[in-house]
Each structure stands twice: as structure tokens, then as C-alpha cells.
């Protein structure tokens, strides 16, 4: 059944247009009703990033939860993984993160976590969505049973201590010059503080949120500012988080950007040497580079691929017993510690590897040469276009031409009327020709507007 509100990662859209106070309140009411089982008092934990619209959505959700008798604990600006961690820690029934991740400030969203700290399943999101269209007035609490709301003191310190405990107590970051870019987002206080407490010399940028500048020319999707600062202070490493701090990219001492594929390769190799991999392999998505797969194979590890989205990666990890997975974009999931992607915790694992090996970041984190990869978007009606015979023939011909020396991934976007066409292979010119041919066929099918 097609869903009206929930997408690939919760609910996301334009603030005060798609994401209105009314919708936020209804989501909280529906979620509160769903999670109120048993006679004890129930509670929700709410965190947010630094967008201006976060205040509006936060208070609307407080009204929703308390109206159905659920108490609310307000964390303020906190990373998404901190909300996931604090939900079970505070014995809450549900956790909420108000964020649109790497999107600009005009957007916002709602991510929901269960009492175990994991994102809700598709089935539970469908239940919540079904309740949105029903009359929740039948479930409203009596005046004496309304919920209470309060700010939680010390939540940031608790998360900082959690991140530090992912490293051995004897490990210090003393001697490392680190630039941390917090994207003017949710990690702007906790990330620099955690690195400083671990002994590093810290230079922080993207730590002056004003409600409007989240992800603006900073963060993991805009690394130019980080590269500049690394050169300026002659840092050993640069670390960039996104707006809700659940993804990370690295910049080495030479100012070169290192993506999630390279980070997974480095951590996998390091954990393999230490005997820490739960299985001889990792989990990544269809979009991860073929070079990663070849590198892992060369050291005796496998790569299990899933559909795009950190949720799919985590589901496969849990189902098959992996403890390392992620996405090229920098979502790195370390399930020994976290129930979701955690940019800071992943960065700490890289830093621990750098300290253990005693080598520059460029040597520690560059494990393979990426295969040339080309990604283009075509604005079309995906359902109609991908079913047309001509489009199918062009795609099949592309697969035939690449053979074992490359890959094609053609998939509809989960959030907009776009088909994403990704091709990779050893012959860049051939890949580009194949991708262009597929885009041309899609545009000729049912074009909206080519990008």
C-alpha cells in the first residue's frame, strides 16, 4: 500500500507546508496511542537539530503526546544517534528526532525510534499512518491523565560519555590536530567536546547555528570549508558531520576527501586484524563502489548489498549477524555500539585506527582506487518509464556492454519524481555513454523535465 507521509527515512518535507504543526501533533498522538500498552506511565524522548522550524514541530509534538497521556522528555539539539541511544537509556517507549538530515533549513522531518532504540519498522509506520486518518479524539486522555513535559539536564554529557566509551580507556587522541565540521547542526556542541575530552587539539567550524545556516556551505555534503581549514591549520585529519550527525566523511592531511566506502574498507580491515568482525564481511548498498567490493575480496571479506537507505543496511545486518555496514554517503553503522548510523562514533573508530597504526590518514583510509562512477538524475514518471520496452532494451544493452567489468543501478527515488541512473566500470568513457543512452531513453519516454 502506498504511504502518504512516511518515506524512506521517516517523514520529511517543506516546513510549515508538508510538515505542519497539525501533522506533527497528529503523528505524536497516533504514535502515543500505538505505544501506550500496559498500565504504567509512558514517555517519549524528543531531540532535534538546529533548524528554525524545530521549535514549531517540537511543541506541536509535545501537545500531541501529552494529549494522549504520554510524558515527554525534551533533549534539545542532539544528534540522531544520541536520541536512538537515550530512548532505551531513559526507559522511554518511543524516541523522536526532528530533522531533515543534510537538507537545507527550509525542510524538516520526523524520525521515530522504538523502545529498543531502532527505527520503527515499515509495518509500525503503516500503523501510525493509518491512525492519522482516524478520529484520535476517541483516545484523548482525561484532564487528570494528561502527560507532562520537561527538559532533560545533562543529556549532552551522557551522549559524550557514551561516544568515549566506544574506545578503550587507555586510548588518547593526544598529538592529533583535528578539524571538526559540525554543519551548524545537531552535533555542534557534543562533537568538539568529545574530541577535546579525548585529548585531541580541536579546531571547530560549523558550530554557530542560527536556525538558517544548517548544512549551508558546511558539513559532509559541502566539504570545501573543511578542506580549507585542514590546510590552514595543517591538521592531521578533518571530520565532517551532516545536520543531524548520523553521517560522516573524512578529509586527510593533504585535503583529499574520503567517502563512506573508503571508511568502511579501513574499519573492516582494522577490525579483521583485531578479530572484531562478527562475520567475514560487511553490508553496503547498491550504490557502493565496485572498488570496495574488489578490495574486500582481496583481503578475504565479502560485501553484501542492499537497497539504498541505512535502514535496509541495518535490517540486513541484524538478520544475518553483521556488525559493520553503511553507505557511500557516510552513514556508518557499528552495531556493537549503535542502533543507527553515528558519525562521531564512526570517526572515533577511524581515529583509533590511525593511532594504532601510527600512519597518516591518507595511508590508513585510502584502501582502494574507486572504479569510475557516474550518477545522473532524470525527472520522469518512474513507474511508466521503466516499464517501456525501449527503455528496457537500452538498459539490457548497457548491462551486456559492461559485463563483469562494471555495474548499472537504475532506481526510482523514494522522495521525488526522479529516476537515478548510476553506472560504474573500468572504462569511464563506456560508462558515460551507457548512462547517457539510458537517460536519453528515459527522457523520451515520459519526461517531466530533464536535469
Swiss-Prot record:
Protein name per Swiss-Prot or TrEMBL: Phosphoglucosamine mutase
NCBIfam families membership: glmM (TIGR01455), PRK10887.1 (NF008139)
HAMAP family (alphabetical): GlmM_B
InterPro entries: A-D-PHexomutase_a/b/a-I, A-D-PHexomutase_a/b/a-I/II/III, A-D-PHexomutase_a/b/a-II, A-D-PHexomutase_a/b/a-III, A-D-PHexomutase_C, A-D-PHexomutase_C_sf, A-D-PHexomutase_CS, Alpha-D-phosphohexomutase_SF
Cofactor note as given: Binds 1 Mg(2+) ion per subunit.
Cofactor: Mg(2+)
CDD domains, alphabetized: GlmM
Sites where the protein binds Mg(2+): 101, 242, 244, 246
GO cellular component: cytosol
Reactions catalysed, as given in the entry: alpha-D-glucosamine 1-phosphate = D-glucosamine 6-phosphate
Single GO term (MF): phosphoglucosamine mutase activity
Keywords, in A-Z order: Isomerase, Magnesium, Metal-binding, Phosphoprotein
Taxonomic path: Bacteria, Pseudomonadati, Pseudomonadota, Alphaproteobacteria, Hyphomicrobiales
Top-level taxon of origin: Bacteria
Active site: 101
BP terms from Gene Ontology: carbohydrate metabolic process; peptidoglycan biosynthetic process; UDP-N-acetylglucosamine biosynthetic process
Cysteine pairings via disulfide bonds: none
PTM annotation (Phosphoserine): residues: 101
Function: Catalyzes the conversion of glucosamine-6-phosphate to glucosamine-1-phosphate.
Protein EC: 5.4.2.10
Source species of the chain: Beijerinckia indica subsp. indica (strain ATCC 9039 / DSM 1715 / NCIMB 8712)
